[in-house]
Design a protein with these regions (language model features):
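Conserved beta-strand positions in repeat-built beta-propeller and related beta-rich domains
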Residues: 72-78, 113-119, 155-161, 202-208, ...
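Short loop/turn segments that connect beta-strands within beta-propeller blades
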Residues: 85-89, 126-131, 168-172, 215-220, ...
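Beta-rich catalytic cores
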Residues: 60, 78, 101, 119, ...
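Blade-level signature of beta-propeller repeat domains, shared across WD40, Kelch, NHL, RCC1
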Residues: 314-346
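Beta-strand-rich domains and repeat architectures in extracellular enzymes and scaffolds
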Residues: 53-80
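Surface loop/turn motifs at the tips and blade-to-blade linkers of beta-strand repeat domains
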Residues: 53-57, 94-98, 136-140, 177-186, ...
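Residue-level detector of Asp-centered blade-edge/turn motifs that repeat once per structural unit
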Residues: 66-69, 107-110, 149-152, 196-199, ...
Length: 346
C-alpha cells in the first residue's frame, strides 16, 4: 500500500447561516433583497464556500450531478420530487412517485437527469423541460446502487437484487450477472458503484466480494481483487486518463486502479465515513467524509481535507463541474459549493 502524504485545511467554527426562501407556484425562490443571499456568500467567500438551504425542513438531498450547462441536479430522499439548482435558485421538479434511496444519478448529453428509485422499482428520466419518463423493472422488489450514462446514451446501474450490473437503452433492460444469485446479504456480491469509461467499458464495485468488476463493450467480464480485505467498497469514478478511483469505506481508504494494479491512500481522519466520489477535470479525486464533516481531495498522492463551514454538516453526495467547482449534498438540508480557486489550493 502506498501511504498518502497528508495536508489538512480547516476553516474553523462558524455560525449557522440562513438562506431565506419561499415557495411561489411550486417554484422555490431565493430572497435576494437585503443581506439574505448576499450575506451568505460574503460571509464565507474568503473560505470559498457557498451553501444553499433546502426550502423545507424535511428535504434530504442525496446524490448530486452537474449538467454541461451548469445545472446542478440532486435527488431527494422520501420526496416526490427531484431538485435542481440554477442561477442560485433551487427548484423542485415533481416526479409523481416518492423516492426511496435514490442513490444513482447522472445526466446525459442532452441534459436530462436519470436516477434510481427503489420504491417505484424504476429508472426515471427527467428532461430539461421537466418531462418525466419512468422505466419499470421486472422484479417485485428492487435494491439499486449507483448509476452512470455512457457516451452512446446507455444507462448503466447496479442492481443487487439480481446480482447484476444492468444496462438500459432504447427502453430495453439487459442484465450482466456479476455473481451467484442468492439472497441480498453477505452471500450476495453486492454490486454498488458504477462508472463507464470513454471506451464504453463499464466498471463496478462488488461490495461483499471485495472486488472491482470490468465489463467490456463485447460483454467480456473480469474481476480484480482489492488488496485490503473486507475494505467495504463503495462509490467509484473514472478520470481523464482512464484510471479507476474507488472508495474503501470500511478501510477508510481511497484507491486508484490503473495498469492492472491498485494504489491505496489512507484517509487521515479515522472512521471518516466515506460516502461518495467524483473526479475533477483537473484530475483530482474528491470524496465526502460524512462523519468528519469534511470533503477530501487526492492529488499527486497527497490527501487534503477541507472542513465544512457548519459543525453539524453531513456531506453525502459530491460532483465537480466543468470549471472544477466542487458541489456536495448535505443530509441536514443543504447544497454546497467549494469554489474552484479554493479547491485547487488548500
Amino acid at each position: 500500500m502506498r501511504p498518502a502524504r497528508i495536508r489538512r485545511t480547516s476553516f474553523g467554527r462558524f455560525r449557522n447561516p440562513r438562506l431565506w426562501l419561499f415557495v411561489a407556484g411550486g417554484i422555490v425562490v431565493a430572497l435576494a433583497a437585503g443581506a439574505g443571499v448576499t450575506g451568505l456568500i460574503g460571509r464565507w467567500a474568503r473560505w470559498g464556500f457557498v451553501e444553499f438551504k433546502m426550502p423545507n425542513r424535511t428535504d434530504i438531498p442525496v446524490a448530486v450531478v452537474v449538467a454541461r450547462d451548469g445545472t446542478v441536479w440532486f435527488t431527494l430522499e422520501a420526496s416526490d420530487a427531484v431538485g435542481r439548482l440554477r442561477n442560485g435558485v433551487i427548484q423542485k421538479v415533481g416526479t409523481g412517485r416518492e423516492n426511496l434511496e435514490p442513490l444513482g444519478l447522472a445526466v446525459d448529453a442532452e441534459g436530462s437527469a436519470w436516477y434510481t428509485n427503489a420504491r417505484a422499482r424504476s429508472i426515471t428520466r427527467i428532461s430539461a423541460d421537466g418531462a418525466v419518463t419512468s422505466f419499470p423493472l421486472s422484479t417485485p422488489v428492487a435494491r439499486l446502487g449507483r448509476l452512470s450514462v455512457a457516451a452512446d446514451g446507455a444507462v448503466w446501474f447496479a442492481e443487487p437484487t439480481t446480482v447484476s450490473v444492468t444496462r438500459l437503452k432504447d427502453g430495453v433492460f439487459m442484465r450482466y450477472t456479476v455473481g451467484p444469485l442468492s439472497p441480498v446479504g453477505s452471500s450476495n456480491v453486492g454490486p454498488f458503484g458504477v462508472a463507464v469509461d470513454p471506451q464504453g467499458t463499464v466498471w463496478a464495485t462488488l461490495q461483499n466480494a471485495n472486488k472491482l468488476a470490468r465489463i467490456r463493450p463485447d460483454g467480456e467480464m473480469a474481476v480484480f481483487e482489492v488488496p485490503t480485505p473486507r475494505s467495504g467498497l463503495g462509490d467509484l469514478a473514472v478520470d481523464g486518463r482512464g484510471a479507476i478511483w474507488l472508495l474503501e469505506s470500511g478501510a477508510n481508504k481511497v484507491a486508484r486502479f490503473a495498469g492492472g494494479r491498485f494504489e491505496e491512500f489512507s484517509v487521515p481522519t479515522p472512521n471518516a465515513g466515506l460516502t461518495a466520489l467524483a473526479v475533477a477535470p483537473d484530475g483530482a479525486a474528491w470524496f465526502t467524509e460524512l462523519r468528519a464533516h469534511k470533503l477530501g481531495r487526492v492529488r499527486d498522492g497527497i490527501i487534503t481535507e477541507f472542513t465544512l463551514p457548519r459543525s453539524d454538516a453531513r456531506p453525502f453526495g459530491i460532483a465537480v463541474d466543468a470549471r472544477n467547482n466542487v458541489w456536495y449534498t448535505d443530509l441536514s438540508g443543504w447544497i454546497g459549493r467549494l469554489a474552484a480557486e479554493r479547491a485547487r489550493g488548500g
